[in-house]
């Protein structure tokens, strides 16, 4: 064994880290480095106030590579984590490493997870994808991303770090390298400082990023009758400042903060109708159209503005010959969709994706299906930003309170499981009490659970863990048929991979949607038009 070589490597690693990081109190006198590239200067200056130092000769050596142990130490220092000099991480290859206390600190904080085989590889140079992973976990950046982002760099497509890098790009933390993103590229000292400083400087920003994958219109207020603020916007990544339970989001535009709906309003016109360029019968007739389902982009009294192949046109609903009104029980019915956790509560940690974003994305997809296909109103108990309530216990009460306040007809809570990495499968719960003092809809809840469970098993092709009785607050305290479904285990490789996929989450949403329709069929209503 070449012990001299090993000692030399360890010494070099410790030296690099100590040169990169030093206690803030040693930086009383401001230093400047002559070799820092312009693009990294602001970041270097920023971290010098926290924990950054240079070489003994007064240089910074920006092109020097940084290893994983040094990166862990830098993250621990910038995050202000408590360092126990005696602490050991769980990784076998890092227990006796010079950076062991720092690796233990960032592991405890949930910033790192190792390579999946029980090792951390602390002396290995860190690549850009791994650096992105540290930043996303350390600053909970996934909580600032709504839905799925497009991959803008060709060299990221199919790479395990694509989703992580996409988040950094969308949040303005990274712009790539000029000729790609280079996820396997080794991080230099300058790049490490740039990554960390840019992320830390933006930590007070609570806005979200979302890719709007269709043309969209903005409005003055969260209402189609509030007035259109501009022509259609092309599909793009948008900055979201607020999201409401009814599907409206406040976004940043070049003319200030405006509103747009997550889902376009669809309305079925049952008779022949005439369209106009303005909301006035005195304006020119543009055309006559056969009965069809239209997209409504604006409302003004009895008039609605719709999208046609020839552009936006107005029609007067008062002129329509309405079909004989049927007794449609769906009108006015509200379905409460409850995506579990949220905000600071990420739920179970997943191999690929944590519970909270999985269930929120699935819930939004369910809501969209109801908005597009039925007269139902589907409301979410939380937005993408936070969980309701002051703490976990209060959050449960707020969810039930929301359901009651909005006169929910049924309540469906969506979760994902986690245990030890080996457990897998799908299960759905309902509440059954020895007395009827709590939720009295035991039989309805059971049938609803059975219908949703059956659809999910078929759609997700997961192990059927069954329909179970659960003494869960949101089921017990509700005053409507209520169920809680666990889609799968995010910490299981097979289940987690499915739940990480937008396509599989769409399958889950469609299964929940169909299961709810099945429930209403069981209740004696003809739902065939809505499947």
Swiss-Prot record:
Enzyme Commission (EC) number: 3.5.1.-
Alphabetized Pfam families for the sequence: Amidase_3 (PF01520), SLH (PF00395)
A biological-process GO annotation: peptidoglycan catabolic process
Residue ranges annotated for the MurNAc-LAA domain, each copy included: 335-517
Similarity comment text for this entry: In the C-terminal section; belongs to the N-acetylmuramoyl-L-alanine amidase 3 family.
Protein known as: Uncharacterized cell wall amidase pXO2-42/BXB0045/GBAA_pXO2_0045
Subcellular location, record wording: Secreted, Cell wall, S-layer
CDD domains according to UniProt: MurNAc-LAA
Hydrolase in keyword set: yes
Top-level division of the source organism's lineage: Bacteria
Residue span, SLH domain: 29-85, 86-149, 150-210
Signal peptide: 1-28
Gene3D superfamilies named in the record: Zn-dependent exopeptidases (3.40.630.40)
An annotated Gene Ontology molecular function: N-acetylmuramoyl-L-alanine amidase activity
Naturally occurring in which organism (per UniProt): Bacillus anthracis
Record has Repeat as a keyword: yes
Class of enzymatic activity (EC top level): hydrolase
């Amino acid at each position: 064994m070449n012990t001299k070589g090993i000692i030399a490597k360890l010494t070099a690693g410790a030296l690099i880290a100590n040169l990169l990081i030093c206690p803030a109190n040693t930086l009383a006198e401001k230093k400047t480095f002559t070799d820092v590239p312009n693009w990294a200067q602001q970041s270097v200056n920023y971290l010098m106030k926290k924990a950054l130092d240079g070489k003994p000769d007064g240089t910074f050596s920006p092109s020097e590579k940084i290893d994983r142990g040094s990166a862990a130490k830098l993250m621990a220092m910038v995050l202000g984590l408590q360092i126990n000099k005696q602490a050991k991480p769980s990784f076998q290859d890092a227990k006796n490493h010079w950076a062991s206390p720092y690796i233990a600190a960032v592991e405890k904080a949930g910033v790192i997870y190792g390579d999946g085989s029980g090792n951390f590889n602390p002396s290995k140079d860190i690549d850009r994808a791994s650096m992105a992973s540290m930043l996303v976990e350390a600053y909970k950046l996934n909580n600032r991303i709504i839905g799925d982002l497009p991959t803008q760099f060709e060299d990221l497509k199919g790479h395990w770090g694509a989703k992580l890098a996409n988040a950094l790009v969308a949040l303005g933390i990274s712009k790539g390298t000029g000729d790609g993103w280079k996820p396997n590229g080794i991080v230099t000292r300058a790049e490490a400082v740039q990554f960390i400083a840019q992320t830390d400087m933006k930590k007070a920003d609570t806005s979200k990023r979302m890719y709007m994958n269709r043309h969209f219109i903005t409005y003055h207020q969260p209402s189609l009758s509030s007035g259109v603020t501009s022509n259609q916007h092309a599909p793009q990544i948008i900055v979201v400042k607020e999201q409401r339970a009814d599907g409206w989001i406040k976004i940043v535009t070049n003319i200030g903060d405006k509103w747009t709906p997550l889902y376009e309003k669809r309305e079925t016109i049952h008779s022949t109708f005439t369209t106009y360029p303005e909301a006035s019968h005195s304006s020119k007739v543009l055309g006559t159209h056969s009965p069809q389902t239209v997209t409504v982009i604006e409302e003004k009294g009895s008039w609605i503005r719709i999208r046609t192949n020839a552009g936006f046109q107005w029609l007067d609903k008062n002129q329509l010959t309405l079909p004989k009104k049927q007794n449609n029980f769906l009108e006015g019915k509200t379905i409460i969709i409850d995506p579990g956790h949220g905000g600071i509560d990420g739920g179970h940690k997943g191999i690929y994706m944590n519970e909270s974003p999985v269930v929120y994305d699935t819930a939004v997809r369910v809501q969209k299906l109801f908005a597009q296909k039925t007269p139902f109103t589907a409301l979410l108990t939380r937005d993408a930003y936070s969980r309701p309530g002051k703490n976990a216990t209060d959050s449960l009460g707020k969810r039930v309170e929301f359901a009651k306040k909005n006169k929910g007809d049924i309540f469906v809570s969506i979760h994902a499981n986690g245990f030890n990495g080996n457990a897998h499968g799908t299960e759905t719960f309902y509440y059954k009490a020895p007395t009827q003092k709590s939720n009295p809809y035991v039989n309805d809840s059971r049938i609803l659970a059975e219908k949703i469970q059956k659809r999910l098993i078929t759609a997700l092709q997961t192990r059927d863990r069954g329909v179970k009785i659960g003494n869960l607050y949101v089921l017990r305290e509700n005053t409507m048929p209520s169920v809680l479904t666990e889609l799968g285990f995010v910490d299981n490789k097979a289940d987690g991979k499915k739940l990480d996929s937008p396509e599989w989450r769409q399958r889950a949403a469609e299964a929940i949607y169909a299961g709810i329709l099945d429930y209403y069929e069981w209740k004696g209503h003809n739902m065939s038009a809505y499947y």
